[in-house]
Amino acid sequence: MKTIKRIYILALFMLCLSFSHNSALAATVSSDLLKQPAIEVSVSLGNAANELKFEPNSLEFVAGKRYNLRLTNPSQMKHYFTAKDFADGIWTQKVEAGKVEIKGAIHEVELKPGATADWVFVPLKSGKYTLRCSVAGHTEAGMTGEITVTN
């Protein structure tokens, strides 16, 4: 019985050691990502003529690189930057808008007329993702785009 107890304690110790190693590794990786300079990419949601489009409507990112996606809305209407599948495949460091900084998972960003927001993230999963404005009628009017993440 003592042998089984010792094996159990040893297994529990090894499991705890494994978890602490993974936490340290995750902290190191996160720290390394934060040291990368963010690559600046800008997208306009609409334009001064109130056309329903993203400019540019095609975005390309490389997995593992840190980006600052600057979203601006020069139009007189609110717009959404909606790309849920893309957002599920990235690590978001933060979104900054005005004097507010938001941390955690982001799936959609709403920009009111004249607004600007900076979304700092690292793509993790390669693929092609649909971008759209989810304001009623905007997707149907052509306010769509594509996001590509390569390895």
Each model region followed by its residue ranges:
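Positively charged n-region of N-terminal signal peptides that target proteins for export
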Residues: 1-6
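Bacterial N-terminal signal peptides
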Residues: 9-20
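Sec/Tat signal peptide C-region and signal peptidase I cleavage site
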Residues: 21-26
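Extracellular/periplasmic metallocenter environments
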Residues: 27, 107-151
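N-terminal edge beta-strand
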Residues: 34-66
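Short beta-strand and strand-turn-strand segments in soluble, beta-rich domains
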Residues: 51, 96-104
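Beta-strand cores of secreted/periplasmic/IMS beta-sandwich domains, seen most often
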Residues: 58-82, 117-125
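Short aromatic-acidic-glycine turn motif
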Residues: 87-98
